[in-house]
Amino acid sequence: MHEKCMSFLTLVAGRRTEERKIRGMKKPAIEGGTPVRETKIYYGHQYIDDADIQAVVDVLKSDNLTCGPKIGELEEKLCQLTGARYAVVCSNGTAALHMAAMAAGVGAGDEVITTPITFAASANCVLYCGGRPVFADIDPETYNIDPEKVEAAITERTKAVVAVDYTGQSVELDRLSEICRKHGLVLIEDGAHVIGTTYKGRANGSISDMTTFSFHPVKTVTGGEGGAVLTNDETLYKKLLLYRAHGITREEAQMEHEADGAWYYEQVELGYNYRMTDIQAALLISQLDKLPLFKQRRKEIVARYNEAFDRLPMLFVQKEIPESDTTRHLYILRIVPERLTIDRKQFFEALAAENVCCNVHYIPTYYFPYYEKQGYKKGLCPNAEKLYEEMLSLPLYYAMTDADVESVIEAVTKIALYYEQK
């Protein structure tokens, strides 16, 4: 009986191989075929030109490596870009979120609602303040946090919402702002993916109570590391300045004692050393000059991917949000498991064998052991969990050539068709 079963399976496998040959399919590299690419391509990469290098060299030759004029220059440039009244730059995107949570008044026992499909910092910033993250599910087509799920999660302990502009497409800021006003909550927009994006004609960074940016190398513009918090609220702005620099001030209006002299300063809050260096700021100022080019190229690549993958029934393309003119940070491709003979992990590995190195953004935050120990369990956000099981992040960055883009499309198509469920 066992031998008969094995013979049957061998026969089926042989027929499938013959069918693929008849259809002219190329064998995937993981099955012994030839890789689409000779060299590896990764999901993200910074773009640094001679102007960026010169900007950094100029600072290195100057008197101010930190706490110098480039900080104010960068903050002014961010305000001009977004229309926000105030910008406070800092050491990284996580620091920006922590500062924003502190400025929002998050403390022990407070709840803050966020999405599980994000980097851990979006929730960790709440824990830093002694609060508790509450996870709300995502829209199954846009993958952004669902405003109705946010409102359903509000309790008397809710203090704020951290809404992530996932992949660079804006969250529904009108609806989220309405919900937050109705319930007296602070809206913190985690805009790590969204610099250069507009929502209904207004720049992200000028709409929410606070918006945070990240300038990690895989982001659209980079300072090596770096972050920023933008706001239109002067009170929040002054708090952010304190939290960035140890809670120390030289402003007489903020001091409790009379100044002894020009050297005098006071610590009036418990803050941190979250300062950005002038070296980072100079690089970012130069990078921001290229933001329109970066945005346009990313949009071109996304459009080409969408055109290619929308035709394949075993793949699902993320829904475009028409109100969001986006600087796309990530390209998320989703497999349709019932139409394939392989799962996401196998698809991922097959692409790697073609020298197309993808990633997965993100593991739901509450899956991590640290969060499990805090009492979070799987099943909280079904849409987010299903997305995680099916998604891949494809290469997307400014320096990709047309040939790079077409090689990614060829590799994905090759694998999707070869392993199509018949």
Spans of model-derived segments:
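Conserved active-site segment immediately N-terminal to the catalytic lysine
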Residues: 189-222, 238, 263-268
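N-terminal "arm"/small-domain region of PLP-dependent enzymes with the aminotransferase-like
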Residues: 2, 23-65, 69, 265-268, ...
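Short beta-strand-to-turn element immediately C-terminal to the catalytic PLP-Schiff-base lysine
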Residues: 213-214, 227-232, 285
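PLP-dependent aminotransferase-like
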Residues: 102-191, 198
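Phosphate-binding glycine-rich loop
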Residues: 64-111, 125-129, 135-137, 202
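PLP-dependent aminotransferase class I/II
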Residues: 72-76, 84-87, 148, 152, ...
